[in-house]
Amino acid sequence: MARYRHSRSRSRSRYRRRRRRRSRYRSRRRRSRGRRRRRSRRGRRRRGYSRRRYSRRRRRRY
């Protein structure tokens, strides 16, 4: 029983990770698309922050 429970949690975490990766790619695509359309200070600042955050996450993963 314990073993089954463990495997279940493991698969769940894996699914969550995959989902996050997908959303990340999607957001990246949308950002490049809207970049030309509107140039706002808010979007610019957000981009820099997210970039820093992703670099940190990448380091941890690899």
Swiss-Prot record:
* The name this protein goes by in its record: Sperm protamine P1
Q: Can you name the source organism?
A: Notamacropus eugenii (Tammar wallaby)
Primary role = Protamines substitute for histones in the chromatin of sperm during the haploid phase of spermatogenesis. They compact sperm DNA into a highly condensed, stable and inactive complex.
Subcellular location(s) of the protein: Nucleus; Chromosome
**Organs and tissues of expression:** Testis.
Question: Known InterPro entries for this protein?
Answer: Protamine_P1
Cite the GO molecular-function annotations of the record: DNA binding
Q: Which GO terms describe its biological process?
A: chromosome condensation; sperm DNA condensation
Q: Where is this region: Disordered?
A: 1-62
Gene Ontology CC = nucleosome; nucleus
The family assignment reads:
Belongs to the protamine P1 family.
Q: What is the lineage of its organism?
A: Eukaryota, Metazoa, Chordata, Craniata, Vertebrata
User: Which keywords does the record carry?
Assistant: Chromosome, Developmental protein, Differentiation, DNA condensation, DNA-binding, Nucleosome core, Nucleus, Spermatogenesis
